Amino acid sequence: MGPRRQKRKPETPRRRPASPAPAAPRPTPSLGTSSRPLARRRHTVLKEIRTLQKTTHLLLRKSPFCRLAREICVQFTRGVDFNWQAQALLALQEAAEAFLVHLFEDAYLLSLHAGRVTLFPKDVQLARRIRGIQEGLG
């Protein structure tokens, strides 16, 4: 005799859901903006650039810049810590920001000349090299 086989139970039909739940409606973009996140991000970046170009306030925060200026001063004076006037630090920060803005403008023009939109370190290096020793700080 062979192995015994069990009787099969009749299967009860399983309940299936009628249909999948409808997806939640996506919010429609207002004022005709593109629904793609990349295009939206690009527009917000361009808007931020335009607003920052119109402003005249300082973009670097004062306390980190003051700490950096004092740290560099201590390095060049062999440990002697000088007292800085607030106006002197403000003038130094204005000059540093003007230098950086001008450098990045030139570097971005070089990247556009190369047919790119992305700014690479080699663009900044070339801008400093073209400026020379006086304007490029060596």
Swiss-Prot record:
Keywords: ADP-ribosylation, Centromere, Chromosome, DNA-binding, Methylation, Nucleosome core, Nucleus, Phosphoprotein
Chain positions covered by the region annotation Important for flexibility of DNA ends that protrude from nucleosomes: 37-52
Pro residues biased stretches: 19-28
Residues bearing PTM Phosphoserine: 19
GO cellular component, one term: nucleosome
Residue list for modification N,N,N-trimethylglycine: 2
Primary location group: nucleus
Region called H3-like, residue ranges: 39-138
Subunit structure: Component of centromeric nucleosomes, where DNA is wrapped around a histone octamer core. The octamer contains two molecules each of H2A, H2B, CENPA and H4 assembled in one CENPA-H4 heterotetramer and two H2A-H2B heterodimers. CENPA modulates the DNA-binding characteristics of nucleosomes so that protruding DNA ends have higher flexibility than in nucleosomes containing conventional histone H3. Inhibits binding of histone H1 to nucleosomes, since histone H1 binds preferentially to rigid DNA linkers that protrude from nucleosomes.
Free-text function comment from the UniProt entry: Histone H3-like nucleosomal protein that is specifically found in centromeric nucleosomes. Replaces conventional H3 in the nucleosome core of centromeric chromatin that serves as an assembly site for the inner kinetochore. The presence of CENPA subtly modifies the nucleosome structure and the way DNA is wrapped around the nucleosome and gives rise to protruding DNA ends that are less well-ordered and rigid compared to nucleosomes containing histone H3. May serve as an epigenetic mark that propagates centromere identity through replication and cell division.
Name of the protein in its database record: Histone H3-like centromeric protein A
